[in-house]
Design a protein with these regions (language model features):
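Conserved glycine-rich Rossmann-like NAD(P)H-binding loop of the short-chain dehydrogenase/reductase
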Residues: 27-38
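Flexible, glycine-rich beta-alpha linker
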Residues: 114, 131, 156-165
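Rossmann-fold cofactor-recognition segment
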Residues: 41-53
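N-terminal Rossmann NAD(P)H-binding glycine-rich loop of SDR-like oxidoreductase domains
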Residues: 5-25
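SDR active-site strand-loop-helix element
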Residues: 8, 32, 67-70, 105-111, ...
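Active-site Tyr-X1-5-Lys
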Residues: 130-156
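NAD(P)H-binding glycine-rich loop region in Rossmannoid oxidoreductase-like domains
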Residues: 50-88
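Conserved Rossmann-fold NAD(P)-dependent oxidoreductase catalytic core, especially the SDR/UDP-sugar
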Residues: 92-132
Length: 165
């Protein structure tokens, strides 16, 4: 049986490419997004409001082996108050997934967590975000690491730089 992966934000620019790559590897893929304009014929669409689904969200999503959490609002509006407003929603989603039994979660971060930095950047570069977006993403990274440790899950943080296409 193929590994099951759920992708949040599957209809976004990055999400579409992630879903295609996972399907090409023969994985069983489920997708969630507010807007799924593009049809993923081999992916299972899950119609769930991620941020209002309750504590049993993991069951509602079909208990996938892994979740790739890409969903985010106003990513290109760096000082939108939506970043701070939505942070608790992301926290509760991730907590409820892990509490429900999820053992592997990957979350999309951003170069904006690091802030302004000259020189090479690696996993040990200190984060000094300079926008509400960067502050929120950095906070979610720290929260997710704490929750993954608490629930014995594997956490992977994906930090993207200069997405073009």
């Amino acid at each position: 049986m193929a590994k099951t992966v759920l992708v949040t934000g599957a209809g976004g620019y990055i999400g579409r490419h992630v879903v295609r790559a996972l399907l090409a590897r023969g994985l069983d893929v489920s997708v969630v997004d507010l807007r799924l304009d593009e049809v993923f014929l081999r992916a299972r669409r899950v119609d769930v409001d991620l941020f209002n689904a309750g504590e049993d969200i993991y069951d509602q999503l079909g208990r996938p082996d892994a979740v790739i959490h890409l969903a985010w609002r106003d990513g290109f509006v760096h000082n939108s108050p939506a970043h701070i407003d939505d942070l608790p929603k992301h926290y509760h989603l991730i907590e409820n997934l892990l509490k429900g039994g999820l053992k592997q979660i990957a979350v999309m971060g951003s170069m904006h967590e690091v802030g302004y930095w000259e020189g090479a950047i690696d996993a040990d570069t200190p984060c000094k975000p300079a926008s509400l977006y960067g502050i929120s993403k950095n906070s979610l990274r720290q929260i997710t690491a704490l929750l993954a440790s608490q629930y014995g899950a594997q956490m992977q943080w994906i930090r993207a730089y200069y997405i073009v296409g």
